[in-house]
């Protein structure tokens, strides 16, 4: 819960992107869209463009560095989007901007997480223009940024881990800013002890003041957890702005101040994707035996 893709394994995956059809009929069909050319690479950080025709994702390049790639879903080969002539820079966790540029997380600061002696690289946010290779760093945080995504009002929502002079077990805060990096402000969780972490934040399509995200701990279960709908217009602190825990209805959300917040909690979720305000695609492990 303090690391990013730069700390993840770069071998032994047999990953590919597939298109599934026949979901309603039950006659499930599978078509391979992309298979990494680099042996053992995972394929992660999937982001669909607003036109529904292009998909951006992260995979290894030929030097086994993480790079952002894009594929046209109507046909064609994948292309590497991030092309920077620096042998030790990596890019991942990207999102499209409406003007054709993109945001991504990068190890551009060349710094590490203090409490693990720098062994996990810190990711900060960059602005990148694929048309000409222009690159600009937008955040200068001691610790990690995650999950940039464009909101309906044009601002960018993301998660920032605060560390300096704070109880850092409990300080992964949802932020928002302008796409050029100005006006970086807290959106949810500043000054709160619950939850420890909020990951995979995604705005709802119509009720644009709301977003969905996964709450998790600090140590313990990594990156997965409980699925919540948030409304910062109601409150921006602790459980007071959490309006529903999914898939439950009317279940009280009780704030707990503890390190391993979601150990032994079921179901567990990662990567929610709202289709509507009421319907979500999400990866789930429903029980310890799933």
Pin down the residues of each PLM region.
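Sequence signature of WD/YWTD-type beta-propeller architectures
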Residues: 1-290
């Amino acid at each position: 819960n303090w690391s990013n893709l730069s700390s993840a394994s770069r071998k032994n995956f047999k990953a590919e992107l597939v298109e599934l059809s026949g979901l309603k009929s039950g006659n499930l069909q599978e078509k391979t869209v992309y298979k990494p050319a680099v042996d053992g690479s995972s394929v992660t950080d999937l982001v669909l463009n607003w036109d529904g025709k292009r998909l951006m994702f992260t995979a290894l390049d030929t030097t086994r560095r993480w790079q952002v790639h894009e594929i046209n879903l109507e046909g064609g080969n994948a292309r590497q989007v991030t092309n920077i002539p620096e042998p030790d820079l990596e890019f991942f966790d990207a999102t499209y901007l409406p003007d054709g540029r993109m945001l991504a997380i990068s190890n551009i600061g060349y710094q590490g997480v203090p409490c693990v002696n720098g062994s996990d690289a810190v990711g900060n946010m960059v602005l990148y223009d694929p048309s000409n290779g222009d690159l600009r760093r937008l955040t200068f945080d001691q610790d990690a940024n995650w999950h940039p995504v464009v909101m309906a009002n044009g601002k960018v929502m993301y998660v920032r881990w605060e560390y300096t002079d704070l109880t850092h077990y409990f300080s992964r805060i949802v932020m928002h800013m302008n796409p050029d990096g100005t006006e970086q402000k807290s959106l949810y969780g500043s000054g709160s002890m619950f939850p420890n972490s909020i990951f995979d934040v995604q705005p709802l399509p119509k009720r644009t003041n709301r977003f969905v995200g996964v709450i998790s701990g600090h140590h313990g279960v990594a990156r997965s957890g409980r699925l919540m709908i948030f409304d910062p217009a109601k409150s921006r602190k602790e459980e007071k702005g959490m309006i529903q825990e999914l898939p439950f209805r009317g279940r009280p959300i009780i704030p707990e101040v503890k390190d391993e917040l979601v150990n032994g909690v079921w179901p567990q979720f990662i990567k929610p994707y709202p289709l509507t305000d009421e319907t979500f695609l999400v990866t789930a492990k429903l029980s310890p035996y799933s």
